[in-house]
UniProtKB/Swiss-Prot annotation:
The FAD cofactor is bound via a bicovalent 6-S-cysteinyl, 8alpha-N1-histidyl FAD linkage. Gene3D superfamilies: 3.30.465.10. The keyword Secreted applies. It comes from Thermothelomyces thermophilus (strain ATCC 42464 / BCRC 31852 / DSM 1799). This is VAO-type flavoprotein oxidase VAO615.
Length: 574
């Protein structure tokens, strides 16, 4: 038995024994301290079954606290503080940690007093370092026998707390890193190059693999996000979406383990209902995904640009008129397979353009309508066009440095998929512009980040992506920041403000839109309609077919209404 597991079992009464020593009815999952909690012998037996792949959770920030793990190291703690909130590798490679500060719950973080005991809080009690289907099957069997909560974590980029849970046994998919290039995938629904990716493959690894074979693949703007996990299962927007659709549109196969331990492959023609649900219906809900096979696209040159402008020469009113015009000009640009990802503040806009296949002359032509409009308003923008020889080079030019990128992380995220029709109509475009303007003036939630796309006509097998994506043009989210100098009560109030004030404001200004289920607030009340729309009833039928006992629970996931997390963190039947 690994020393870490032995140490954890010895500390179980102090580190995680936070509940009273009582039995709880089967309607609730057990927690450490309950009489029904698995014994040390049970956990050791599971570890043997898993060939030593069971990890006792020891939070990274235990180095910042003097008890109970005995790892206090002031210098290591200072180093951890400097990288704690960065969306690169600090939490990605940690078995039990998650990135969202509001789900860290102040239980064991670098910013509290060293005398405060390091407690697991919302973190899982144990983690399975999954190496294949057999590990998942053994963990699911153990969890159901002992009534232990199951969670699934890949990289921990998770705004809604789906990948963690108090007292849980976590399936850590992060080290399933296999990649396979398929030169000519053949199926009734697709013939061409493809890639089979293990569940733990991150964006930067998928991009490198595709690049090495002369291809590109649809993935996210943060390169440390796991491309196979909740990203694609929830839809997956990309700077390539206007050319190839969202990530879910590109999936050819899902390899999974179901709640009852079956090892299945789901495609548009085999277990097609499960394929449909996994392709847009959200991660952690229907089955445990081991791998994904997705389309690759032939690589080539990619035009790019930095485009920025502000109100310094023309005043704020003219600046906002220019923002409205920028949006009105986007449809033609996007329909050519191009995109902008950009941020909008109260007095400046900064955009990065992606134009697949565009040489320098084409880049200049594509930018001309935007530049002419700005010139007509007396605005001189910053424009830095360039042409990259391939997509990998383009991506890391604008979203690098390679391999981990520099994406900031904002835990209080709301989002809105804004219909194209609202920005092409001058009257409703003015309402959308007012929305941008109002949110940009809320200090803790500015700037407004947006990705633009056109995916209405992209070929794809039937999937469960919210229909609003097909009629949408923008996905926008305010940047809700965390402040470790503020009190927990102040941060909780900020969280509620995002859900109860900002999101309704965004909804009201954009009728016909929806909320992206991967980038949303966990307190949002209207999640069922906004995340899933008319697909929900069918998704629920698939959920009940493949997980009739609701083994898999994630906040705001399909079927999650049958569960509730109480004030102590215990998961109970609603």
């Amino acid at each position: 038995m690994p020393a870490s597991l032995l140490r954890f079992l010895a500390l179980a009464g102090t580190a995680v024994g936070l509940t009273t020593n009582h039995n709880h009815s089967p309607s609730c999952r057990v927690l450490p301290g309950d009489a029904a909690w698995p014994s040390s012998r049970d956990w050791a037996k599971l570890n043997k079954t898993l060939n030593g792949h069971l990890i006792a959770t020891v939070p990274q920030a235990s180095v910042c606290h003097k008890s109970p793990f005995g790892q206090y190291d002031a210098q290591a703690c200072e180093e951890l503080k400097s990288s704690w909130d960065i969306s690169t590798i600090t939490h990605v490679n940690a078995p039990g940690d998650v990135l969202s500060q509001n789900f860290q719950n102040y239980s064991c973080v670098p910013f509290t007093d060293p005398s405060q005991p390091c407690q697991l809080g919302n973190y899982p009690s144990y983690v399975v370092n999954v190496t294949g289907a057999a590990d998942v099957q053994a963990a699911l069997k153990f969890a159901q026998k002992h009534n232990v909560r199951i969670v699934i974590k890949n990289t921990g980029h998770d705004y809604l707390g789906k990948s963690t849970g108090k007292g849980a046994l976590s399936l850590w998919m992060h080290n399933l890193k296999s990649t396979k290039f398929i030169k000519n995938y053949k199926a009734p629904y697709y013939k061409g190059p493809a890639a089979k990716l293990g569940a733990g493959v991150e964006g930067f690894e998928a991009y490198a693999m595709a690049n090495s074979t002369g291809h590109r693949i649809v993935g996210g703007t943060c390169p440390t996000v796991g491309i196979v996990g909740g990203y694609t299962q929830g839809g997956g927007h990309s700077i390539l979406s206007s050319s190839y659709g969202v990530a879910a549109d590109n999936v050819l196969e899902w390899e999974v383990v179901t709640a009852d331990g079956r090892h299945l492959v789901a495609t548009p023609t085999r277990n097609s209902d499960l394929y449909w649900a996994l392709s847009g219906g959200g991660g952690g809900t229907f089955a445990v995904v081991l791998s994904m096979t997705a389309r690759l696209h032939r690589d080539g040159i990619v035009g790019g640009t930095l485009l920025g402008f502000n109100d310094s020469a023309v005043g704020n009113e003219v600046y906002w008129e220019a923002v409205a015009a920028f949006h009105a000009l986007l449809p033609d640009f996007l329909d050519g397979g191009n995109s902008f990802t950009y941020s909008v503040g109260n007095n400046s806009l900064t955009a990065y353009g992606t134009m697949p296949g565009a040489d320098r002359d084409a880049v200049d032509r594509l930018l001309r309508p935007f530049l002419d409009d700005l010139a007509s308003r007396g605005i001189t923008p910053v424009v830095q066009p360039r042409v990259s020889t391939n997509y990998y080079d383009h991506f890391f030019t604008y979203l690098g440095p390679a391999p981990y990128g520099n994406a900031a992380y904002f835990p209080f995220t709301n989002s809105r998929i804004i219909p194209r029709s609202l920005v092409t109509d001058p009257k409703s475009n003015a309402v959308v512009t007012d929305l941008f303007r109002n949110i940009s003036q809320v200090p803790a939630f500015s700037p407004f980040y947006c990705d633009s796309f056109s995916v209405a006509d992209k070929p794809h097998p039937a999937n469960s992506l919210h229909p609003a994506w097909r009629t949408g043009m923008l996905l926008c989210a305010p940047a809700g920041s965390w402040d470790w100098d503020a009190s927990p009560e102040e941060m909780a109030a900020r969280d509620r403000y995002a859900a109860e004030t900002l999101q309704p404001m965004m909804d009201a200004a954009t009728p016909g839109g929806s909320v992206y289920l991967n980038e949303a607030n966990h307190l949002y009340a209207n999640w069922k309609e906004s995340f899933y729309g008319d697909n929900y009833a069918r998704l629920l039928r698939v959920k009940k077919k493949y997980d009739p006992d609701s083994v898999f629970y994630v906040k705001t996931g399909v079927g999650s209404e049958v569960w509730d997390v109480d004030a102590t963190g215990r998961l109970c039947r609603a």
